C-alpha cells in the first residue's frame, strides 16, 4: 500500500496511518 492510500487503508483496520520510507505502516490506536 502506498503512502497515498495509507489513511484509507488503515482506517478500515481502526489503525493510524504512518509513512515509513514511502511504505504504509498502520499503527494500532
Swiss-Prot record:
Tissue expression profile of the protein: Expressed by the venom gland.
Disulfide bond is among the record's keywords: yes
Gene Ontology terms: cellular component: extracellular region
MF-aspect GO terms: ion channel inhibitor activity; potassium channel regulator activity; toxin activity
Keywords: Calcium-activated potassium channel impairing toxin, Disulfide bond, Ion channel impairing toxin, Neurotoxin, Potassium channel impairing toxin, Secreted, Toxin
Pfam families referenced in this protein's UniProt entry, alphabetically: Toxin_6
Classification via SUPFAM superfamilies: Scorpion toxin-like (SSF57095)
Disulfide topology: 3-19, 6-24, 10-26
Domain of life: Eukaryota
InterPro entries in the record: Scorpion_toxin-like_sf, Toxin_alpha-KTx_8/9
Localisation per UniProt entry: Secreted
The protein's role, per its UniProt record: Blocker for the small conductance calcium-activated potassium channels (KCa2).
Miscellaneous remark of the record: Negative results: does not or very weakly inhibits KCa2.2/KCNN2 (Kd >1 uM) and KCa2.3/KCNN3 (Kd >1 uM).
Entry's free-text remark on domains: Has the structural arrangement of an alpha-helix connected to a beta-sheet by disulfide bonds (CSalpha/beta).
Annotated family: Belongs to the short scorpion toxin superfamily. Potassium channel inhibitor family. Alpha-KTx 08 subfamily.
Protein name in UniProt: Potassium channel toxin alpha-KTx 8.1
Lineage of origin: Eukaryota, Metazoa, Ecdysozoa, Arthropoda, Chelicerata
